[in-house]
Amino acid sequence: MTDKIAVLLGGTSAEREVSLNSGAAVLAGLREGGIDAYPVDPKEVDVTQLKSMGFQKVFIALHGRGGEDGTLQGMLELMGLPYTGSGVMASALSMDKLRSKLLWQGAGLPVAPWVALTRAEFEKGLSDKQLAEISALGLPVIVKPSREGSSVGMSKVVAENALQDALRLAFQHDEEVLIEKWLSGPEFTVAILGEEILPSIRIQPSGTFYDYEAKYLSDETQYFCPAGLEASQEANLQALVLKAWTTLGCKGWGRIDVMLDSDGQFYLLEANTSPGMTSHSLVPMAARQAGMSFSQLVVRILELAD
């Protein structure tokens, strides 16, 4: 008897719409691969009942809080249900950009200079020391919530008088916010599938940076896979990504986003342990370049579930 698979999609995070699209694609791909899969939306179904509903395994196609941050993973482990992607700790760390950066920095890996602020500090008014630290980053900077995905709540700040508004927006989404030095070079993403690192992708957004619209709505964002790097650069990038992935304790599948600055140095941005799987998504694109169909990709991700 084949396993009955729950594809978790939708949910209640800010990335619900993206997740519904990802989940629909994953569901179709699994069924094409002969898998007995069914959609389950945690917004409508009590996921503590998955086992009593007869499911033996879970494919997590949720993005953001409640699906990608370790909470769901912990519950599935308590229930004894195997699931796709990283475990509790790696999921929680990857969702938290600040703590990812601290870990990577501690491991000697390159990250962009940043200043972290809490909502309480912002509401009280920033100290002279904090203002000096922010000023030392130079302009432009990028302001982002620490625990939000899909570039939700993120802004590029090019003038000092725009910083307060950018912080206000970011604090609508999280208690902690990062102000990061703007890196001017191209952005790359590298997907990981089991032990395999897939070909890197270079991202060229039509706007200022790779924001929510560029990720999911724009037809003008350009993707290059292969990324056009020299063989030695591609090897350096893959080695950096593998180190970043293992430092966080990630497993199964996911991707890591990286910037190449004008100084020729790669800088780690963030890890995604449950990336998008829509028509615009990057992991399927990298898999295609490696000779793998979408259906083969999702079946392989499911095989890696434990």
Curated annotation (Swiss-Prot):
One GO MF term: protein homodimerization activity
Location in or out of the cell: Cytoplasm
Catalysed reactions, as listed in the record: 2 D-alanine + ATP = D-alanyl-D-alanine + ADP + phosphate + H(+)
Major subcellular location class: cytoplasm
PROSITE patterns: ATP_GRASP, DALA_DALA_LIGASE_1, DALA_DALA_LIGASE_2
Keyword Cell wall biogenesis/degradation: yes
Keywords: ATP-binding, Cell shape, Cell wall biogenesis/degradation, Cytoplasm, Ligase, Magnesium, Manganese, Metal-binding, Nucleotide-binding, Peptidoglycan synthesis
Residues at which Mg(2+) 1 binds: D257, E270
Residue spans crossing the bilayer: none
Cofactor note text: Binds 2 magnesium or manganese ions per subunit.
Tagged with keyword Magnesium: yes
Pathway listed: Cell wall biogenesis; peptidoglycan biosynthesis
GO biological process: cell wall organization; peptidoglycan biosynthetic process; regulation of cell shape
Residues binding Mg(2+) 2, per UniProt: E270, N272
Active site residues of this protein: E15, S150, S281
Cofactor(s) required, per the database record: Mg(2+); Mn(2+)
EC number(s) recorded for this UniProt protein: 6.3.2.4
Record domain ATP-grasp: where: 101-303
GO CC term, one of those recorded: cytosol
Family: Belongs to the D-alanine--D-alanine ligase family.
PANTHER family membership: D-ALANINE--D-ALANINE LIGASE, D-ALANINE--D-ALANINE LIGASE B
Function statement: Cell wall formation.
Subunit comment: Monomer.
Record-given protein name: D-alanine--D-alanine ligase B
